Amino acid sequence: MMLLKKGRLLMFLGSQVIVVALFIHMSVHRHLSQREESRRPVHVLVLSSWRSGSSFVGQLFGQHPDVFYLMEPAWHVWMTFTSSTAWKLHMAVRDLLRSVFLCDMSVFDAYMNPGPRKQSSLFQWEQSRALCSAPVCDFFPAHEISSPKHCKLLCGQQPFDMVEKACRSHGFVVLKEVRFLSLQALYPLLTDPSLNLHVVHLVRDPRAVFRSREHTTIELVVDSHIVLGQHLETIKEEDQPYYAMKIICKSQVDIVKAIQTLPEALQQRYLFLRYEDLVRAPLAQTTRLYKFVGLDFLPHLQTWVHNVTRGKGMGQHAFHTNARNALNVSQAWRWSLPYEKVSQLQDACGEAMDLLGYLQVRSQQEQGNLSLDLLSSSHILGQVFREG
């Protein structure tokens, strides 16, 4: 009897040891998994359209020392197939972005001349602080705000393979892109297990976008032709800017509606941002952006954001981020566009304006009355995406 009791006791103690061992093993495994997840690179796509303030938002990320940033890598795809359409190029753009997110820069071989190349072969490479500092270029400290103008002079001759090295040395990879007119093309990236993708969807008042496009017509001529696609030959030249805006506005509507149909887990990887909200409260909105992707808002970046949005005038170059009064820039269409153009544009983009929270003006007097706030706080995005 005593032997039987001892045997049962030993079996009980043995089972407890096994349970404890399993618990320790599972705890260690969970801890290691969490640590691996925390080390996993974060991929961020700033999704926008032309002349919507996306260069500034790209710089908000790109100036952070933990970020590898590229501005519009899909430019290379579109400039290779200038006779194609945006819809036909979606797949090629998506595949290029996936490769760049994974720091595989060999994807550019299909869109660049063969043979040795420099990092200056990349479109707007000098906008990337990561390509202007170590390990790529030693002229600029990694923890200081980089100057694209000076970087272009000093760092352009670095070999192209340094781009991949720089990418792999950062924990965040951020790409800014304006050449997606549909969310459907992005679905494979959102569900790709090799990516940790977050999407920042930036929009801007279509009237401000239209005004800015008027000032950059020559620079955007190829992009506009690709957007218009088969409609290019059938639409009068004077109507083409409005039709291009109609397509762009519809794409923003489609993206927002598509996001609302995604599973909640994927919706949590999406952040909606209006340019006007950003320039009204740049520090608060930048804090929101950084929190969304897991970046710290460092003191020197807070100072830079304050200064770059509180400069004088309208800025020196349409495609560069420099000190300007960002709030005045966002309102410039109200005193510079004739009401006839505004009215025609509102007809083309009415659905997008209602959805995104931009109030229409019904007269020249309303347009010029700057005390009349045309930014609505009660819009569908505020109801669906309440974070921030």
Swiss-Prot record:
The record's section on InterPro entries has: Carbohydrate_sulfotransferase (IPR016469), Gal/GlcNAc/GalNAc_ST (IPR051135), P-loop_NTPase (IPR027417), Sulfotransferase_dom (IPR000863)
The pathway this protein participates in, as annotated, is:
Protein modification; carbohydrate sulfation
**What Enzyme Commission number(s) apply to this enzyme?**
2.8.2.-
Q: Which domain of life is it from?
A: Eukaryota
Q: Kindly state which reaction or reactions the protein catalyses.
A: 3-O-{N-acetyl-beta-D-glucosaminyl-(1->3)-beta-D-galactosyl-(1->3)-N-acetyl-alpha-D-galactosaminyl}-L-threonyl-[protein] + 3'-phosphoadenylyl sulfate = 3-O-{6-O-sulfo-N-acetyl-beta-D-glucosaminyl-(1->3)-beta-D-galactosyl-(1->3)-N-acetyl-alpha-D-galactosaminyl}-L-threonyl-[protein] + adenosine 3',5'-bisphosphate + H(+); 3-O-{N-acetyl-beta-D-glucosaminyl-(1->3)-beta-D-galactosyl-(1->3)-N-acetyl-alpha-D-galactosaminyl}-L-seryl-[protein] + 3'-phosphoadenylyl sulfate = 3-O-{6-O-sulfo-N-acetyl-beta-D-glucosaminyl-(1->3)-beta-D-galactosyl-(1->3)-N-acetyl-alpha-D-galactosaminyl}-L-seryl-[protein] + adenosine 3',5'-bisphosphate + H(+); a 3-O-{beta-D-galactosyl-(1->3)-[N-acetyl-beta-D-glucosaminyl-(1->6)]-N-acetyl-alpha-D-galactosaminyl}-L-threonyl-[protein] + 3'-phosphoadenylyl sulfate = 3-O-{beta-D-galactosyl-(1->3)-[6-O-sulfo-N-acetyl-beta-D-glucosaminyl-(1->6)]-N-acetyl-alpha-D-galactosaminyl}-L-threonyl-[protein] + adenosine 3',5'-bisphosphate + H(+); 3-O-{beta-D-galactosyl-(1->3)-[N-acetyl-beta-D-glucosaminyl-(1->6)]-N-acetyl-alpha-D-galactosaminyl}-L-seryl-[protein] + 3'-phosphoadenylyl sulfate = 3-O-{beta-D-galactosyl-(1->3)-[6-O-sulfo-N-acetyl-beta-D-glucosaminyl-(1->6)]-N-acetyl-alpha-D-galactosaminyl}-L-seryl-[protein] + adenosine 3',5'-bisphosphate + H(+)
Q: Which residues are glycosylated?
A: N307, N328, N369
Molecular functions per Gene Ontology: N-acetylglucosamine 6-O-sulfotransferase activity
Main subcellular localisation: Golgi
Which major enzyme category is it?
Answer: transferase
Membrane association type: Single-pass type II membrane protein
Binding of 3'-phosphoadenylyl sulfate occurs at 50-56, 204-212
The residue ranges for the Cytoplasmic side of the membrane come to 1-7
Q: Of which family is this protein a member?
A: Belongs to the sulfotransferase 1 family. Gal/GlcNAc/GalNAc subfamily.
- Explain the purpose of this protein: Sulfotransferase involved in SELL/L-selectin ligand biosynthesis pathway. Contributes to generate sialyl 6-sulfo Lewis X determinant (also known as MECA-79 epitope) for SELL recognition, a prerequisite for continuous lymphocyte homing into peripheral lymph nodes and antigen immune surveillance.
Q: What is this protein called?
A: Carbohydrate sulfotransferase 4
Question: What organism does this protein naturally occur in?
Answer: Mus musculus (Mouse)
Q: Lineage of the source organism?
A: Eukaryota, Metazoa, Chordata, Craniata, Vertebrata
Q: Which gene encodes it?
A: Chst4
